[in-house]
Protein backbone atom coordinates (compact mmCIF):
# COMPACT_ATOMS: atom_id res chain seq x y z
CA UNK A 1 0.00 0.00 0.00
CA UNK A 2 2.78 2.41 0.96
CA UNK A 3 4.65 1.62 -2.25
CA UNK A 4 1.52 2.29 -4.36
CA UNK A 5 1.05 5.65 -2.65
CA UNK A 6 4.70 6.52 -3.22
CA UNK A 7 4.43 5.65 -6.92
CA UNK A 8 1.24 7.72 -7.23
CA UNK A 9 2.88 10.71 -5.55
CA UNK A 10 5.94 10.30 -7.77
CA UNK A 11 3.76 10.16 -10.91
CA UNK A 12 1.77 13.23 -9.88
CA UNK A 13 4.97 15.11 -9.10
CA UNK A 14 6.37 14.20 -12.51
CA UNK A 15 3.17 15.32 -14.21
CA UNK A 16 3.22 18.61 -12.30
CA UNK A 17 6.82 19.29 -13.31
CA UNK A 18 5.99 18.49 -16.94
CA UNK A 19 3.00 20.85 -16.96
CA UNK A 20 5.03 23.56 -15.26
CA UNK A 21 7.83 23.32 -17.81
CA UNK A 22 5.33 23.43 -20.68
CA UNK A 23 3.63 26.49 -19.29
CA UNK A 24 6.73 28.54 -18.53
CA UNK A 25 8.79 29.95 -21.44
CA UNK A 26 11.95 29.96 -19.38
CA UNK A 27 11.53 26.25 -18.66
CA UNK A 28 10.38 25.23 -22.10
CA UNK A 29 12.65 23.75 -24.71
CA UNK A 30 12.98 26.38 -27.41
CA UNK A 31 12.20 25.55 -31.00
CA UNK A 32 15.25 25.36 -33.26
CA UNK A 33 16.02 28.88 -34.49
CA UNK A 34 15.16 29.88 -38.06
CA UNK A 35 17.78 29.33 -40.73
CA UNK A 36 17.42 32.69 -42.47
CA UNK A 37 15.80 36.04 -41.73
CA UNK A 38 15.40 38.92 -44.19
CA UNK A 39 15.26 42.55 -43.09
CA UNK A 40 14.26 45.01 -45.81
CA UNK A 41 15.58 48.52 -45.29
CA UNK A 42 18.85 49.60 -43.65
CA UNK A 43 17.73 52.77 -41.91
CA UNK A 44 17.61 53.02 -38.14
CA UNK A 45 14.58 50.69 -38.03
CA UNK A 46 16.10 47.93 -40.15
CA UNK A 47 19.58 47.97 -38.65
CA UNK A 48 18.31 48.03 -35.06
CA UNK A 49 15.90 45.20 -35.94
CA UNK A 50 18.84 43.14 -37.20
CA UNK A 51 20.72 43.95 -33.99
CA UNK A 52 17.87 42.78 -31.75
CA UNK A 53 17.10 39.74 -33.92
CA UNK A 54 20.70 38.63 -33.51
CA UNK A 55 20.43 39.02 -29.74
CA UNK A 56 17.23 36.97 -29.54
CA UNK A 57 17.84 34.22 -32.12
CA UNK A 58 21.56 33.76 -31.55
CA UNK A 59 24.69 33.48 -33.63
CA UNK A 60 23.67 30.71 -36.05
CA UNK A 61 20.78 32.37 -37.89
CA UNK A 62 21.73 34.08 -41.15
CA UNK A 63 20.36 37.63 -41.41
CA UNK A 64 20.25 39.34 -44.82
CA UNK A 65 19.72 43.11 -44.79
CA UNK A 66 18.46 44.62 -48.05
CA UNK A 67 19.08 48.26 -48.94
CA UNK A 68 18.74 49.80 -52.39
CA UNK A 69 20.37 53.10 -51.45
CA UNK A 70 22.77 53.98 -48.62
CA UNK A 71 22.87 52.45 -45.15
CA UNK A 72 21.22 54.97 -42.85
CA UNK A 73 18.08 55.59 -44.89
CA UNK A 74 16.53 58.90 -43.92
CA UNK A 75 19.42 59.64 -41.54
CA UNK A 76 21.15 61.16 -44.53
CA UNK A 77 23.84 63.82 -44.74
CA UNK A 78 24.52 66.51 -47.32
CA UNK A 79 27.88 67.90 -48.44
CA UNK A 80 28.80 71.58 -48.44
CA UNK A 81 32.33 72.29 -49.67
CA UNK A 82 33.76 69.04 -48.32
CA UNK A 83 31.89 69.09 -44.99
CA UNK A 84 28.96 66.82 -44.06
CA UNK A 85 25.77 68.16 -42.49
CA UNK A 86 22.67 66.35 -41.24
CA UNK A 87 19.84 66.54 -43.77
CA UNK A 88 17.11 64.94 -41.71
CA UNK A 89 16.98 63.45 -38.20
CA UNK A 90 19.53 65.67 -36.50
CA UNK A 91 18.88 65.70 -32.73
CA UNK A 92 18.27 63.00 -30.12
CA UNK A 93 16.46 63.49 -26.80
CA UNK A 94 18.39 62.67 -23.59
CA UNK A 95 15.63 60.18 -22.67
CA UNK A 96 15.90 58.24 -25.95
CA UNK A 97 17.30 55.17 -24.21
CA UNK A 98 17.64 52.92 -27.27
CA UNK A 99 19.74 55.50 -29.11
CA UNK A 100 21.82 56.10 -25.98
CA UNK A 101 22.42 52.37 -25.64
CA UNK A 102 23.41 52.00 -29.29
CA UNK A 103 25.95 54.82 -29.03
CA UNK A 104 27.43 53.29 -25.89
CA UNK A 105 27.52 49.71 -27.24
CA UNK A 106 29.05 50.82 -30.54
CA UNK A 107 31.67 53.07 -28.93
CA UNK A 108 30.51 56.19 -30.77
CA UNK A 109 31.02 59.77 -29.58
CA UNK A 110 28.34 62.40 -29.11
CA UNK A 111 28.10 66.15 -29.54
CA UNK A 112 25.65 68.58 -28.02
CA UNK A 113 23.04 69.91 -30.44
CA UNK A 114 23.73 73.37 -31.84
CA UNK A 115 22.80 76.14 -29.46
CA UNK A 116 22.26 79.78 -30.26
CA UNK A 117 19.27 82.04 -29.92
CA UNK A 118 15.88 81.46 -31.52
CA UNK A 119 13.24 83.81 -32.88
CA UNK A 120 9.64 83.38 -34.11
CA UNK A 121 8.64 85.32 -37.25
CA UNK A 122 4.99 85.90 -38.19
CA UNK A 123 5.50 87.50 -41.61
CA UNK A 124 5.66 91.04 -40.27
CA UNK A 125 7.89 90.94 -37.22
CA UNK A 126 9.68 88.74 -34.74
CA UNK A 127 6.96 88.05 -32.17
CA UNK A 128 9.43 86.37 -29.84
CA UNK A 129 13.22 86.49 -29.50
CA UNK A 130 15.33 84.51 -27.07
CA UNK A 131 17.80 86.24 -24.80
CA UNK A 132 21.12 84.97 -23.49
CA UNK A 133 19.68 85.45 -20.01
CA UNK A 134 17.34 82.75 -18.68
CA UNK A 135 15.45 85.15 -16.41
CA UNK A 136 14.84 87.53 -19.32
CA UNK A 137 13.34 84.66 -21.34
CA UNK A 138 11.05 83.74 -18.44
CA UNK A 139 9.87 87.33 -18.12
CA UNK A 140 9.24 87.57 -21.88
CA UNK A 141 7.24 84.34 -21.94
CA UNK A 142 5.15 85.23 -18.88
CA UNK A 143 4.55 88.76 -20.17
CA UNK A 144 3.27 87.56 -23.54
CA UNK A 145 1.69 84.18 -22.72
CA UNK A 146 1.19 84.05 -18.97
CA UNK A 147 2.20 80.68 -17.50
CA UNK A 148 1.23 78.69 -20.60
CA UNK A 149 4.85 77.70 -21.34
CA UNK A 150 5.12 76.11 -17.90
CA UNK A 151 1.78 74.34 -18.35
CA UNK A 152 2.92 73.09 -21.76
CA UNK A 153 6.13 71.73 -20.26
CA UNK A 154 4.09 69.87 -17.63
CA UNK A 155 1.77 68.43 -20.30
CA UNK A 156 4.69 67.11 -22.35
CA UNK A 157 6.40 65.72 -19.24
CA UNK A 158 3.24 63.79 -18.35
CA UNK A 159 3.17 62.19 -21.81
CA UNK A 160 6.90 61.39 -21.64
CA UNK A 161 6.56 59.87 -18.17
CA UNK A 162 4.00 57.36 -19.46
CA UNK A 163 5.91 56.79 -22.69
CA UNK A 164 9.04 55.77 -20.74
CA UNK A 165 7.22 52.61 -19.60
CA UNK A 166 8.09 51.01 -22.95
CA UNK A 167 11.71 50.56 -21.86
CA UNK A 168 10.69 48.57 -18.79
CA UNK A 169 8.33 46.41 -20.84
CA UNK A 170 10.98 45.69 -23.45
CA UNK A 171 13.67 45.02 -20.86
CA UNK A 172 11.40 42.20 -19.65
CA UNK A 173 10.95 40.99 -23.27
CA UNK A 174 7.25 41.86 -23.60
CA UNK A 175 5.98 42.52 -27.14
CA UNK A 176 2.84 43.92 -28.77
CA UNK A 177 1.08 42.79 -31.92
CA UNK A 178 -0.19 46.23 -32.98
CA UNK A 179 0.76 49.88 -32.60
CA UNK A 180 -2.54 50.55 -30.84
CA UNK A 181 -1.93 47.81 -28.25
CA UNK A 182 1.57 49.13 -27.62
CA UNK A 183 0.29 52.68 -27.08
CA UNK A 184 -2.57 51.47 -24.88
CA UNK A 185 -0.09 49.60 -22.68
CA UNK A 186 1.78 52.88 -22.19
CA UNK A 187 -0.96 55.44 -21.75
CA UNK A 188 -4.30 53.66 -21.92
CA UNK A 189 -7.23 55.27 -23.69
CA UNK A 190 -5.56 58.69 -23.33
CA UNK A 191 -2.78 57.73 -25.76
CA UNK A 192 -5.22 56.17 -28.21
CA UNK A 193 -7.31 59.32 -28.01
CA UNK A 194 -4.26 61.39 -28.92
CA UNK A 195 -3.99 59.45 -32.20
CA UNK A 196 -7.54 60.41 -33.08
CA UNK A 197 -7.50 64.10 -32.18
CA UNK A 198 -5.52 66.98 -33.60
CA UNK A 199 -2.93 68.70 -31.46
CA UNK A 200 -4.91 71.92 -31.89
CA UNK A 201 -8.12 70.36 -30.58
CA UNK A 202 -6.30 68.73 -27.65
CA UNK A 203 -4.51 71.88 -26.53
CA UNK A 204 -7.51 74.14 -27.02
CA UNK A 205 -9.49 71.79 -24.80
CA UNK A 206 -6.69 72.03 -22.23
CA UNK A 207 -7.10 75.81 -22.18
CA UNK A 208 -4.14 77.06 -24.22
CA UNK A 209 -4.71 80.36 -26.03
CA UNK A 210 -4.82 80.87 -29.78
CA UNK A 211 -1.89 83.28 -29.59
CA UNK A 212 0.27 80.74 -27.76
CA UNK A 213 -0.67 77.94 -30.16
CA UNK A 214 -0.01 80.09 -33.24
CA UNK A 215 3.27 81.59 -32.06
CA UNK A 216 4.86 78.90 -29.88
CA UNK A 217 3.44 75.54 -30.97
CA UNK A 218 2.74 75.75 -34.72
CA UNK A 219 6.33 76.87 -35.58
CA UNK A 220 7.74 73.79 -33.80
CA UNK A 221 5.45 71.51 -35.81
CA UNK A 222 6.51 73.26 -39.02
CA UNK A 223 10.23 72.71 -38.44
CA UNK A 224 9.91 69.14 -37.11
CA UNK A 225 7.18 67.71 -39.37
CA UNK A 226 6.52 70.28 -42.09
CA UNK A 227 2.92 70.54 -40.89
CA UNK A 228 0.95 72.50 -38.31
CA UNK A 229 -1.22 71.88 -35.26
CA UNK A 230 -3.62 69.77 -37.32
CA UNK A 231 -1.31 66.77 -36.81
CA UNK A 232 -2.28 64.16 -34.21
CA UNK A 233 -1.69 65.06 -30.58
CA UNK A 234 0.72 62.19 -29.93
CA UNK A 235 3.21 63.19 -32.61
CA UNK A 236 2.73 66.77 -31.44
CA UNK A 237 3.88 65.80 -27.96
CA UNK A 238 6.90 63.98 -29.43
CA UNK A 239 7.76 67.11 -31.41
CA UNK A 240 7.42 69.41 -28.40
CA UNK A 241 9.70 67.18 -26.33
CA UNK A 242 12.49 68.17 -28.72
CA UNK A 243 12.29 71.68 -27.28
CA UNK A 244 13.91 70.33 -24.10
CA UNK A 245 17.52 70.97 -23.18
CA UNK A 246 20.23 68.34 -23.42
CA UNK A 247 19.59 67.36 -27.04
CA UNK A 248 22.53 65.64 -28.70
CA UNK A 249 23.75 64.04 -31.90
CA UNK A 250 26.33 61.47 -32.96
CA UNK A 251 29.73 62.82 -33.88
CA UNK A 252 30.33 62.00 -37.53
CA UNK A 253 26.61 61.77 -38.29
CA UNK A 254 23.65 59.91 -36.81
CA UNK A 255 23.82 57.45 -39.71
CA UNK A 256 26.94 55.96 -38.06
CA UNK A 257 24.57 54.25 -35.63
CA UNK A 258 23.05 52.37 -38.57
CA UNK A 259 26.36 51.22 -40.02
CA UNK A 260 27.53 50.27 -36.53
CA UNK A 261 24.40 48.20 -35.85
CA UNK A 262 24.77 46.50 -39.22
CA UNK A 263 28.30 45.44 -38.32
CA UNK A 264 27.40 44.47 -34.73
CA UNK A 265 24.50 42.31 -35.92
CA UNK A 266 26.84 40.40 -38.25
CA UNK A 267 24.23 40.74 -40.98
CA UNK A 268 24.89 40.29 -44.67
CA UNK A 269 24.20 43.55 -46.56
CA UNK A 270 22.59 43.06 -49.98
CA UNK A 271 22.70 46.28 -52.01
CA UNK A 272 19.60 45.60 -54.06
CA UNK A 273 16.00 46.64 -54.48
CA UNK A 274 13.32 44.20 -53.27
CA UNK A 275 10.65 43.81 -55.95
CA UNK A 276 8.22 41.33 -54.45
CA UNK A 277 7.66 38.83 -51.66
CA UNK A 278 5.73 35.58 -52.12
CA UNK A 279 4.80 32.78 -49.72
CA UNK A 280 5.86 29.37 -51.05
CA UNK A 281 6.16 25.81 -49.81
CA UNK A 282 9.75 24.58 -49.84
CA UNK A 283 11.34 21.32 -48.72
CA UNK A 284 14.11 22.13 -46.24
CA UNK A 285 17.13 19.99 -45.35
CA UNK A 286 15.00 18.14 -42.77
CA UNK A 287 12.94 16.75 -45.65
CA UNK A 288 9.71 18.31 -44.44
CA UNK A 289 7.73 20.76 -46.62
CA UNK A 290 7.75 24.18 -44.96
CA UNK A 291 6.05 27.50 -45.66
CA UNK A 292 8.70 30.10 -46.47
CA UNK A 293 8.93 33.53 -48.04
CA UNK A 294 10.63 34.04 -51.38
CA UNK A 295 12.18 37.50 -51.62
CA UNK A 296 12.86 38.58 -55.21
CA UNK A 297 15.26 41.49 -55.61
CA UNK A 298 17.22 43.31 -58.27
CA UNK A 299 20.89 44.25 -58.27
CA UNK A 300 21.58 46.44 -61.27
CA UNK A 301 19.89 44.70 -64.19
CA UNK A 302 20.06 41.22 -62.64
CA UNK A 303 17.18 39.60 -60.75
CA UNK A 304 17.86 37.30 -57.80
CA UNK A 305 15.79 35.49 -55.18
CA UNK A 306 16.18 33.67 -51.89
CA UNK A 307 13.97 31.97 -49.28
CA UNK A 308 13.49 33.07 -45.68
CA UNK A 309 11.75 31.77 -42.56
CA UNK A 310 11.01 35.27 -41.26
CA UNK A 311 10.83 38.63 -43.05
CA UNK A 312 10.82 42.07 -41.42
CA UNK A 313 9.91 45.04 -43.63
CA UNK A 314 11.61 48.18 -42.31
CA UNK A 315 10.84 50.63 -45.10
CA UNK A 316 7.60 52.57 -45.66
CA UNK A 317 5.20 50.49 -47.76
CA UNK A 318 4.42 53.46 -49.93
CA UNK A 319 4.53 53.13 -53.73
CA UNK A 320 6.75 56.20 -54.03
CA UNK A 321 9.24 54.87 -51.49
CA UNK A 322 9.61 51.08 -51.55
CA UNK A 323 7.20 49.74 -54.20
CA UNK A 324 7.23 46.17 -52.84
CA UNK A 325 4.56 43.80 -54.19
CA UNK A 326 3.14 40.95 -52.10
CA UNK A 327 2.21 38.03 -54.35
CA UNK A 328 -0.34 35.25 -53.83
CA UNK A 329 -1.06 35.82 -50.14
CA UNK A 330 -4.36 34.49 -48.83
CA UNK A 331 -5.86 36.68 -47.53
CA UNK A 332 -4.11 39.43 -49.53
CA UNK A 333 -1.72 41.75 -47.71
CA UNK A 334 -3.49 45.04 -47.04
CA UNK A 335 -2.71 48.00 -49.29
CA UNK A 336 -0.97 50.98 -47.68
CA UNK A 337 -2.04 54.43 -48.75
CA UNK A 338 -0.32 56.57 -46.13
CA UNK A 339 0.85 59.76 -47.76
CA UNK A 340 4.35 60.93 -46.87
CA UNK A 341 5.09 64.62 -46.45
CA UNK A 342 7.22 66.22 -49.15
CA UNK A 343 9.87 68.46 -47.65
CA UNK A 344 12.96 70.16 -49.08
CA UNK A 345 16.19 70.62 -47.15
CA UNK A 346 18.44 73.37 -48.50
CA UNK A 347 21.92 74.11 -47.18
CA UNK A 348 23.31 77.52 -48.06
CA UNK A 349 26.69 78.96 -47.17
CA UNK A 350 26.17 82.68 -47.18
CA UNK A 351 25.40 85.92 -45.34
CA UNK A 352 21.80 86.11 -44.15
CA UNK A 353 19.65 89.07 -45.17
CA UNK A 354 18.52 89.85 -41.64
CA UNK A 355 16.38 92.79 -42.82
CA UNK A 356 13.69 90.25 -43.79
CA UNK A 357 13.14 89.53 -40.10
CA UNK A 358 14.32 92.65 -38.28
CA UNK A 359 15.21 96.30 -38.83
CA UNK A 360 18.26 95.97 -36.58
CA UNK A 361 21.75 96.09 -38.11
CA UNK A 362 23.27 92.75 -39.07
CA UNK A 363 25.79 92.84 -36.22
CA UNK A 364 22.93 93.29 -33.73
CA UNK A 365 20.68 90.53 -35.11
CA UNK A 366 22.03 87.77 -32.87
CA UNK A 367 19.64 84.94 -33.79
CA UNK A 368 20.91 81.55 -34.95
CA UNK A 369 17.48 80.08 -35.79
CA UNK A 370 14.23 81.58 -37.04
CA UNK A 371 10.99 79.59 -37.07
CA UNK A 372 7.91 80.82 -38.90
CA UNK A 373 4.22 80.82 -38.05
CA UNK A 374 1.51 79.44 -40.32
CA UNK A 375 0.48 82.91 -41.46
CA UNK A 376 3.98 84.23 -42.13
CA UNK A 377 3.53 84.01 -45.95
CA UNK A 378 7.27 83.38 -46.15
CA UNK A 379 8.32 80.52 -48.42
CA UNK A 380 10.26 78.68 -45.68
CA UNK A 381 9.32 76.76 -42.54
CA UNK A 382 12.57 77.53 -40.74
CA UNK A 383 16.16 78.63 -41.16
CA UNK A 384 19.08 78.06 -38.81
CA UNK A 385 22.85 77.95 -38.54
CA UNK A 386 24.18 74.38 -38.45
CA UNK A 387 27.48 72.74 -37.57
CA UNK A 388 29.04 69.97 -39.60
CA UNK A 389 28.72 66.45 -38.19
CA UNK A 390 32.41 66.58 -37.24
CA UNK A 391 32.25 69.80 -35.21
CA UNK A 392 32.08 69.34 -31.44
CA UNK A 393 31.14 72.96 -30.74
CA UNK A 394 28.87 75.57 -32.30
CA UNK A 395 30.44 77.38 -35.27
CA UNK A 396 32.92 80.09 -34.34
CA UNK A 397 31.81 83.68 -34.99
CA UNK A 398 32.34 84.34 -38.68
CA UNK A 399 34.78 87.02 -39.75
CA UNK A 400 32.91 87.67 -43.01
CA UNK A 401 29.35 87.10 -41.76
CA UNK A 402 28.89 83.81 -43.64
CA UNK A 403 27.61 80.61 -42.07
CA UNK A 404 26.09 77.37 -43.29
CA UNK A 405 22.31 77.68 -42.91
CA UNK A 406 19.80 74.84 -43.07
CA UNK A 407 16.41 75.74 -44.54
CA UNK A 408 13.27 73.60 -44.50
CA UNK A 409 10.62 74.46 -47.08
CA UNK A 410 7.57 72.86 -48.69
CA UNK A 411 8.87 73.48 -52.21
CA UNK A 412 12.29 73.66 -53.85
CA UNK A 413 13.71 77.15 -53.43
CA UNK A 414 14.38 79.14 -56.59
CA UNK A 415 17.55 81.16 -57.05
CA UNK A 416 15.49 84.34 -56.64
CA UNK A 417 14.18 83.11 -53.28
CA UNK A 418 17.68 82.24 -52.08
CA UNK A 419 18.87 85.71 -53.13
CA UNK A 420 16.01 87.23 -51.13
CA UNK A 421 17.12 85.32 -48.02
CA UNK A 422 20.84 86.06 -48.41
CA UNK A 423 22.82 89.19 -49.16
CA UNK A 424 25.33 86.89 -50.84
CA UNK A 425 26.04 83.18 -50.89
CA UNK A 426 28.88 80.93 -52.02
CA UNK A 427 27.15 77.58 -52.26
CA UNK A 428 23.69 76.00 -52.13
CA UNK A 429 22.64 72.35 -52.19
CA UNK A 430 19.07 71.02 -52.10
CA UNK A 431 17.51 67.69 -51.14
CA UNK A 432 13.79 67.07 -51.77
CA UNK A 433 12.46 64.00 -49.99
CA UNK A 434 9.54 62.21 -48.38
CA UNK A 435 10.65 62.64 -44.81
CA UNK A 436 7.75 61.54 -42.59
CA UNK A 437 4.03 60.76 -42.81
CA UNK A 438 1.46 63.43 -43.49
CA UNK A 439 -0.53 63.32 -40.29
CA UNK A 440 -4.28 63.59 -40.56
CA UNK A 441 -6.15 62.25 -37.53
CA UNK A 442 -7.95 60.05 -36.83
CA UNK A 443 -5.02 57.74 -37.56
CA UNK A 444 -5.40 54.03 -38.33
CA UNK A 445 -2.02 52.42 -38.00
CA UNK A 446 -0.96 49.62 -40.38
CA UNK A 447 -0.63 46.12 -38.96
CA UNK A 448 2.66 44.94 -37.50
CA UNK A 449 1.88 41.31 -38.39
CA UNK A 450 1.26 41.27 -42.14
CA UNK A 451 1.29 37.46 -42.32
CA UNK A 452 2.32 34.52 -40.15
CA UNK A 453 6.05 35.38 -40.07
CA UNK A 454 6.01 38.64 -42.04
CA UNK A 455 6.31 41.82 -39.96
CA UNK A 456 6.12 45.56 -40.67
CA UNK A 457 8.01 48.09 -38.54
CA UNK A 458 7.08 51.42 -40.07
CA UNK A 459 3.46 51.35 -39.02
CA UNK A 460 4.62 53.03 -35.81
CA UNK A 461 5.27 56.18 -37.84
CA UNK A 462 1.52 56.78 -37.93
CA UNK A 463 1.85 57.56 -34.21
CA UNK A 464 5.10 59.50 -34.53
CA UNK A 465 8.11 59.43 -36.83
CA UNK A 466 11.45 59.69 -35.02
CA UNK A 467 14.70 57.78 -34.67
CA UNK A 468 13.76 56.46 -31.24
CA UNK A 469 10.28 55.43 -32.39
CA UNK A 470 11.88 53.34 -35.15
CA UNK A 471 14.24 51.71 -32.64
CA UNK A 472 11.32 50.91 -30.33
CA UNK A 473 9.37 49.41 -33.24
CA UNK A 474 12.43 47.35 -34.24
CA UNK A 475 12.90 45.95 -30.75
CA UNK A 476 9.19 45.17 -30.52
CA UNK A 477 9.16 43.41 -33.91
CA UNK A 478 12.23 41.34 -33.00
CA UNK A 479 10.62 40.28 -29.70
CA UNK A 480 7.32 39.57 -31.46
CA UNK A 481 9.01 37.42 -34.11
CA UNK A 482 10.95 35.54 -31.43
CA UNK A 483 7.97 34.85 -29.18
CA UNK A 484 5.68 33.82 -32.05
CA UNK A 485 8.38 31.51 -33.42
CA UNK A 486 8.70 29.82 -30.03
CA UNK A 487 5.02 29.90 -29.05
CA UNK A 488 5.49 32.29 -26.11
CA UNK A 489 1.97 33.72 -26.25
CA UNK A 490 2.16 34.87 -22.63
CA UNK A 491 4.83 37.42 -23.65
CA UNK A 492 2.59 39.16 -26.20
CA UNK A 493 -0.17 41.74 -25.58
CA UNK A 494 -0.28 41.28 -21.82
CA UNK A 495 -2.69 43.50 -19.90
CA UNK A 496 -1.74 45.25 -16.68
CA UNK A 497 2.00 45.22 -17.34
CA UNK A 498 2.60 48.54 -15.60
CA UNK A 499 1.10 47.34 -12.32
CA UNK A 500 2.65 43.89 -12.66
CA UNK A 501 6.19 45.15 -13.24
CA UNK A 502 5.87 47.97 -10.71
CA UNK A 503 5.69 45.38 -7.93
CA UNK A 504 8.85 43.59 -9.11
CA UNK A 505 12.21 44.49 -7.64
From Swiss-Prot:
BP terms from Gene Ontology: prenylated protein catabolic process; prenylcysteine catabolic process
Keywords: FAD, Flavoprotein, Glycoprotein, Lysosome, Oxidoreductase, Signal
Cofactor annotation: FAD
Range of residues in the leader sequence: 1-27
Cellular component, GO annotation: lysosome
Compartments it resides in: Lysosome
Enzyme Commission code(s) on record: 1.8.3.5
Recorded catalytic activity of this chain's protein: an S-polyprenyl-L-cysteine + O2 + H2O = a polyprenal + L-cysteine + H2O2; S-(2E,6E)-farnesyl-L-cysteine + O2 + H2O = (2E,6E)-farnesal + L-cysteine + H2O2; [(2E,6E,10E)-geranylgeranyl]-L-cysteine + O2 + H2O = (2E,6E,10E)-geranylgeranial + L-cysteine + H2O2
InterPro entries noted in UniProt: FAD/NAD-bd_sf, Prenylcys_lyase, Prenylcysteine_Oxase1
Chain positions carrying an annotated carbohydrate: 196, 323, 353
Protein name stated in the entry: Prenylcysteine oxidase 1
